[in-house]
């Protein structure tokens, strides 16, 4: 069992290397359909499994196509990680679509709509709070 510090260092290293592979290593055209970025990597305590969370910008069809390309490139990514990262055993790689950025954007949009929908009379001013005392 690896220490927490080692697990986090390996996760950061995998994140950096997979990001580099997405830029110029994976030749599958489906991966280039949507703009892809690695948001997080979760490595198991025994360093045998790595969940790679990716954010994909584009239409739903482009996202599905990109995920299919990433799933088919899993073997290539694992072999490249084995060559680039010095570990006794290269972890099994799983790509997972990360929709947290998309959800965060929706929440911010809703909050902005609510703020714009408020009338200026609804917002108490600093003078109103002083008058009550």
From Swiss-Prot:
A Gene Ontology term for the protein's cellular component: cytosol
GO molecular function: ribosomal small subunit binding
Function of the molecule: One of several proteins that assist in the late maturation steps of the functional core of the 30S ribosomal subunit. Associates with free 30S ribosomal subunits (but not with 30S subunits that are part of 70S ribosomes or polysomes). Required for efficient processing of 16S rRNA. May interact with the 5'-terminal helix region of 16S rRNA.
Assembly and oligomerization: Monomer. Binds 30S ribosomal subunits, but not 50S ribosomal subunits or 70S ribosomes.
Organism: Nostoc sp. (strain PCC 7120 / SAG 25.82 / UTEX 2576)
Keyword Cytoplasm: yes
Alphabetical UniProt keywords: Cytoplasm, Ribosome biogenesis
Gene3D superfamilies: 3.30.300.20
UniProt gene name: rbfA
Name the record gives this protein: Ribosome-binding factor A
Family membership noted in the UniProt record: Belongs to the RbfA family.
Keyword Cytoplasm set for record: yes
Gene Ontology process terms (BP): maturation of SSU-rRNA
Protein location: Cytoplasm
């Amino acid at each position: 069992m690896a220490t927490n510090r080692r697990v986090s260092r390996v996760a950061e290293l995998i994140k950096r290397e997979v990001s580099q592979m997405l830029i110029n290593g994976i030749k599958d055209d489906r991966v280039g359909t949507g703009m892809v970025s690695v948001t997080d990597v979760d490595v198991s305590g025994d360093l045998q499994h790595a969940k790679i969370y990716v954010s994909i910008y584009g239409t739903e069809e482009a996202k599905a196509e990109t995920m299919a390309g990433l799933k088919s490139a899993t073997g290539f990514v694992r072999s490249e990680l084995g060559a680039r990262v010095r570990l006794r055993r290269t972890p099994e790689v799983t790509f997972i679509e990360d929709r947290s950025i998309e959800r965060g954007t929706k929440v911010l949009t809703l909050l902005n709509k609510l703020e714009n929908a408020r009338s200026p009379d609804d917002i108490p001013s600093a003078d109103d709070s002083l008058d009550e005392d």
